[in-house]
A protein has these predicted regions:
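Electropositive polyanion-binding surfaces
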Residues: 1-280
Protein backbone atom coordinates (compact mmCIF):
# COMPACT_ATOMS: atom_id res chain seq x y z
CA UNK A 1 0.00 0.00 0.00
CA UNK A 2 1.02 3.65 -0.32
CA UNK A 3 0.89 3.92 3.47
CA UNK A 4 3.39 1.08 3.85
CA UNK A 5 5.67 2.52 1.17
CA UNK A 6 5.77 5.84 3.01
CA UNK A 7 6.46 4.10 6.35
CA UNK A 8 9.34 2.19 4.71
CA UNK A 9 10.70 5.42 3.21
CA UNK A 10 10.68 7.12 6.61
CA UNK A 11 11.97 4.05 8.47
CA UNK A 12 11.43 5.51 11.92
CA UNK A 13 9.73 8.31 13.82
CA UNK A 14 12.01 11.30 14.38
CA UNK A 15 11.97 13.10 17.71
CA UNK A 16 12.94 16.76 17.96
CA UNK A 17 12.65 18.91 21.10
CA UNK A 18 8.92 19.58 21.39
CA UNK A 19 8.08 17.95 18.05
CA UNK A 20 7.71 14.49 16.49
CA UNK A 21 7.70 13.49 12.82
CA UNK A 22 5.89 10.13 13.01
CA UNK A 23 6.60 7.12 10.80
CA UNK A 24 2.86 6.45 10.58
CA UNK A 25 0.06 9.03 10.31
CA UNK A 26 -0.99 10.48 13.66
CA UNK A 27 -4.45 8.89 13.43
CA UNK A 28 -2.59 5.56 13.74
CA UNK A 29 0.45 6.44 15.87
CA UNK A 30 -1.40 8.56 18.45
CA UNK A 31 -4.86 6.99 18.35
CA UNK A 32 -5.91 3.75 16.68
CA UNK A 33 -2.62 1.88 17.27
CA UNK A 34 -1.73 3.61 20.54
CA UNK A 35 -2.54 2.37 24.03
CA UNK A 36 -5.41 4.36 25.52
CA UNK A 37 -6.87 4.15 29.00
CA UNK A 38 -9.92 1.88 29.18
CA UNK A 39 -9.83 0.98 25.47
CA UNK A 40 -9.28 -2.54 24.09
CA UNK A 41 -6.32 -2.91 21.77
CA UNK A 42 -5.15 -5.85 19.63
CA UNK A 43 -1.53 -6.68 20.40
CA UNK A 44 1.26 -9.20 20.08
CA UNK A 45 2.20 -10.23 23.62
CA UNK A 46 5.20 -12.01 25.10
CA UNK A 47 4.03 -13.68 28.32
CA UNK A 48 6.95 -14.84 30.47
CA UNK A 49 7.36 -16.75 33.73
CA UNK A 50 10.56 -15.35 35.25
CA UNK A 51 12.15 -16.82 38.38
CA UNK A 52 13.89 -14.97 41.18
CA UNK A 53 17.19 -15.72 39.44
CA UNK A 54 16.04 -14.05 36.22
CA UNK A 55 15.68 -17.33 34.32
CA UNK A 56 12.61 -17.74 32.09
CA UNK A 57 10.92 -21.08 32.77
CA UNK A 58 8.32 -20.68 30.02
CA UNK A 59 6.97 -18.07 27.63
CA UNK A 60 4.19 -17.60 25.10
CA UNK A 61 4.35 -15.37 22.03
CA UNK A 62 0.74 -14.79 21.04
CA UNK A 63 -1.93 -12.48 19.70
CA UNK A 64 -3.96 -10.87 22.46
CA UNK A 65 -6.40 -8.13 23.43
CA UNK A 66 -5.35 -5.81 26.25
CA UNK A 67 -7.09 -2.95 28.04
CA UNK A 68 -4.92 -0.37 29.81
CA UNK A 69 -6.22 0.48 33.27
CA UNK A 70 -4.39 3.79 33.47
CA UNK A 71 -2.47 6.15 31.22
CA UNK A 72 0.68 6.73 33.25
CA UNK A 73 3.70 9.01 32.92
CA UNK A 74 7.30 8.25 33.83
CA UNK A 75 7.15 11.01 36.45
CA UNK A 76 4.08 9.52 38.13
CA UNK A 77 5.64 6.05 38.29
CA UNK A 78 8.84 7.53 39.74
CA UNK A 79 6.84 9.31 42.42
CA UNK A 80 5.00 6.09 43.28
CA UNK A 81 8.33 4.29 43.62
CA UNK A 82 9.38 7.13 45.95
CA UNK A 83 6.20 6.49 48.02
CA UNK A 84 4.31 9.66 47.13
CA UNK A 85 1.19 9.36 49.32
CA UNK A 86 -1.17 11.15 46.91
CA UNK A 87 -0.24 8.95 43.95
CA UNK A 88 -0.17 5.77 46.05
CA UNK A 89 -3.79 6.49 46.90
CA UNK A 90 -4.75 7.56 43.36
CA UNK A 91 -3.29 4.39 41.83
CA UNK A 92 -3.99 2.04 44.73
CA UNK A 93 -5.26 -0.67 42.33
CA UNK A 94 -1.90 -0.98 40.55
CA UNK A 95 0.68 0.33 43.02
CA UNK A 96 1.81 -3.16 44.08
CA UNK A 97 2.22 -4.17 40.44
CA UNK A 98 4.48 -1.15 39.92
CA UNK A 99 6.70 -2.08 42.89
CA UNK A 100 6.77 -5.74 41.77
CA UNK A 101 7.59 -4.66 38.22
CA UNK A 102 10.50 -2.53 39.32
CA UNK A 103 11.90 -5.32 41.53
CA UNK A 104 11.60 -7.73 38.60
CA UNK A 105 13.39 -5.29 36.31
CA UNK A 106 16.34 -5.21 38.73
CA UNK A 107 16.53 -9.03 38.56
CA UNK A 108 16.47 -8.93 34.75
CA UNK A 109 19.10 -6.18 34.67
CA UNK A 110 21.40 -8.07 37.05
CA UNK A 111 21.21 -11.26 34.99
CA UNK A 112 21.92 -9.42 31.75
CA UNK A 113 24.98 -7.74 33.22
CA UNK A 114 26.22 -11.10 34.50
CA UNK A 115 25.91 -12.35 30.91
CA UNK A 116 28.05 -9.48 29.65
CA UNK A 117 25.69 -6.56 29.13
CA UNK A 118 27.67 -3.32 29.33
CA UNK A 119 26.21 -0.57 31.49
CA UNK A 120 27.13 2.66 29.71
CA UNK A 121 26.55 6.01 31.35
CA UNK A 122 24.37 8.14 29.10
CA UNK A 123 25.96 11.28 27.72
CA UNK A 124 22.69 12.50 26.20
CA UNK A 125 21.24 15.91 26.92
CA UNK A 126 17.67 17.08 27.49
CA UNK A 127 16.64 20.35 25.85
CA UNK A 128 14.13 22.27 27.98
CA UNK A 129 11.66 24.40 26.02
CA UNK A 130 9.35 27.23 27.03
CA UNK A 131 6.95 28.38 24.32
CA UNK A 132 9.15 26.80 21.63
CA UNK A 133 12.25 28.57 22.93
CA UNK A 134 15.24 26.75 24.44
CA UNK A 135 15.62 27.82 28.07
CA UNK A 136 18.01 25.14 29.33
CA UNK A 137 20.07 22.08 28.39
CA UNK A 138 20.52 19.43 31.08
CA UNK A 139 22.26 16.04 31.25
CA UNK A 140 19.78 13.23 30.73
CA UNK A 141 19.53 11.00 33.81
CA UNK A 142 17.66 7.73 33.36
CA UNK A 143 14.94 7.38 35.99
CA UNK A 144 13.75 4.20 37.72
CA UNK A 145 10.61 4.04 35.59
CA UNK A 146 12.64 4.39 32.38
CA UNK A 147 15.04 1.68 33.57
CA UNK A 148 12.09 -0.62 34.25
CA UNK A 149 10.54 -0.17 30.80
CA UNK A 150 13.94 -0.53 29.10
CA UNK A 151 14.62 -3.81 30.93
CA UNK A 152 11.22 -5.23 29.94
CA UNK A 153 11.64 -4.15 26.33
CA UNK A 154 15.12 -5.68 26.03
CA UNK A 155 13.87 -8.93 27.57
CA UNK A 156 10.91 -9.10 25.16
CA UNK A 157 13.21 -8.37 22.21
CA UNK A 158 15.61 -11.09 23.38
CA UNK A 159 12.88 -13.72 23.77
CA UNK A 160 11.34 -12.96 20.37
CA UNK A 161 14.74 -13.12 18.64
CA UNK A 162 15.58 -16.43 20.33
CA UNK A 163 12.14 -17.83 19.48
CA UNK A 164 12.49 -17.01 15.79
CA UNK A 165 16.13 -18.14 15.63
CA UNK A 166 15.48 -21.61 17.06
CA UNK A 167 12.45 -22.07 14.80
CA UNK A 168 14.74 -21.14 11.89
CA UNK A 169 12.22 -18.63 10.55
CA UNK A 170 12.96 -15.58 8.37
CA UNK A 171 13.88 -12.73 10.69
CA UNK A 172 15.43 -9.27 11.00
CA UNK A 173 18.03 -9.33 13.78
CA UNK A 174 19.71 -6.43 15.51
CA UNK A 175 23.38 -7.42 15.53
CA UNK A 176 26.25 -5.71 17.33
CA UNK A 177 29.80 -6.83 16.56
CA UNK A 178 33.00 -6.88 18.65
CA UNK A 179 34.81 -3.54 19.02
CA UNK A 180 37.35 -2.62 16.35
CA UNK A 181 40.88 -3.77 17.27
CA UNK A 182 42.55 -0.36 16.98
CA UNK A 183 39.88 1.33 19.08
CA UNK A 184 39.98 -1.25 21.85
CA UNK A 185 43.79 -1.06 21.92
CA UNK A 186 43.62 2.71 22.49
CA UNK A 187 41.02 2.20 25.23
CA UNK A 188 43.10 -0.45 27.01
CA UNK A 189 46.19 1.78 26.93
CA UNK A 190 44.22 4.68 28.43
CA UNK A 191 42.73 2.72 31.34
CA UNK A 192 46.03 0.98 32.03
CA UNK A 193 47.50 4.46 32.50
CA UNK A 194 44.80 4.77 35.19
CA UNK A 195 46.21 1.63 36.85
CA UNK A 196 43.59 -0.86 35.58
CA UNK A 197 45.07 -3.92 33.86
CA UNK A 198 43.54 -6.55 31.57
CA UNK A 199 44.53 -10.19 31.28
CA UNK A 200 44.75 -12.19 28.08
CA UNK A 201 44.37 -11.10 24.48
CA UNK A 202 42.99 -7.55 24.47
CA UNK A 203 41.63 -8.04 20.93
CA UNK A 204 39.27 -10.83 22.05
CA UNK A 205 37.82 -9.29 25.20
CA UNK A 206 34.33 -10.54 26.02
CA UNK A 207 31.78 -7.87 26.91
CA UNK A 208 31.61 -8.93 30.58
CA UNK A 209 35.36 -8.14 30.90
CA UNK A 210 34.76 -4.59 29.69
CA UNK A 211 31.74 -4.30 31.96
CA UNK A 212 33.88 -5.33 34.95
CA UNK A 213 36.40 -2.67 33.95
CA UNK A 214 33.68 -0.03 33.77
CA UNK A 215 32.22 -1.15 37.09
CA UNK A 216 35.60 -0.78 38.80
CA UNK A 217 35.53 2.96 38.03
CA UNK A 218 31.98 3.55 39.35
CA UNK A 219 31.86 6.44 41.81
CA UNK A 220 35.22 7.80 40.70
CA UNK A 221 35.93 11.06 38.89
CA UNK A 222 37.27 9.02 35.98
CA UNK A 223 34.02 7.08 35.45
CA UNK A 224 32.34 9.46 32.94
CA UNK A 225 35.54 9.57 30.87
CA UNK A 226 36.04 5.78 30.91
CA UNK A 227 32.38 5.20 30.00
CA UNK A 228 32.58 7.69 27.13
CA UNK A 229 35.83 6.20 25.79
CA UNK A 230 34.40 2.68 25.95
CA UNK A 231 31.25 3.76 24.14
CA UNK A 232 33.38 5.19 21.32
CA UNK A 233 35.07 1.80 20.93
CA UNK A 234 31.81 0.07 20.12
CA UNK A 235 30.84 -0.97 16.62
CA UNK A 236 27.57 0.27 15.17
CA UNK A 237 24.57 -2.03 15.62
CA UNK A 238 23.03 -3.14 12.32
CA UNK A 239 19.92 -4.90 10.99
CA UNK A 240 20.67 -8.23 9.29
CA UNK A 241 18.75 -11.36 8.32
CA UNK A 242 21.45 -13.57 9.88
CA UNK A 243 22.03 -13.71 13.64
CA UNK A 244 25.49 -12.94 15.05
CA UNK A 245 24.48 -11.69 18.52
CA UNK A 246 24.58 -8.37 20.33
CA UNK A 247 27.96 -7.67 21.94
CA UNK A 248 26.97 -4.61 23.96
CA UNK A 249 23.97 -6.32 25.56
CA UNK A 250 25.78 -9.63 25.99
CA UNK A 251 23.04 -11.53 24.13
CA UNK A 252 23.25 -14.37 21.60
CA UNK A 253 20.08 -13.28 19.80
CA UNK A 254 18.46 -9.86 19.69
CA UNK A 255 15.93 -7.96 17.60
CA UNK A 256 13.72 -4.87 17.66
CA UNK A 257 10.15 -6.04 18.31
CA UNK A 258 8.59 -3.66 20.84
CA UNK A 259 8.02 -0.49 18.79
CA UNK A 260 6.11 -1.27 15.56
CA UNK A 261 4.48 2.18 15.55
CA UNK A 262 7.78 4.08 15.35
CA UNK A 263 10.31 1.64 13.78
CA UNK A 264 9.81 -0.15 10.47
CA UNK A 265 11.92 -3.24 11.33
CA UNK A 266 9.65 -3.86 14.36
CA UNK A 267 6.58 -3.57 12.13
CA UNK A 268 8.04 -6.05 9.67
CA UNK A 269 8.86 -8.49 12.48
CA UNK A 270 5.24 -8.30 13.71
CA UNK A 271 4.10 -9.28 10.22
CA UNK A 272 6.51 -12.23 10.12
CA UNK A 273 5.35 -13.45 13.54
CA UNK A 274 1.67 -13.18 12.61
CA UNK A 275 2.22 -15.13 9.41
CA UNK A 276 3.88 -17.87 11.45
CA UNK A 277 1.11 -17.88 14.08
CA UNK A 278 -1.47 -18.29 11.30
CA UNK A 279 0.49 -21.05 9.58
CA UNK A 280 1.40 -19.10 6.46
Amino acid sequence: SELDKEALRRGTSIYYPGKVIPMLPEILSNDLCSLREGVDRYTLSVKMHIGYDGEISEYDLCESVICSKHRMTYDDVNRILEHDEYLLDKYSDIKQMIFDGYNLSRVIDKKRKQSGGINFESNEAVIVLNKDKVVDIKPRIQSKSEQMIEDFMIEANRVVAGHMFYLDLPMIYRNHDYPKADRIADFVKTVEDMDYHFRGNIYELESYVLNNCLKSFEGSVEYPLVSSLLLRCMAKAVYETGCTGHYGLGLKEYCHFTSPIRRYPDLQIHRIIKENLHGK
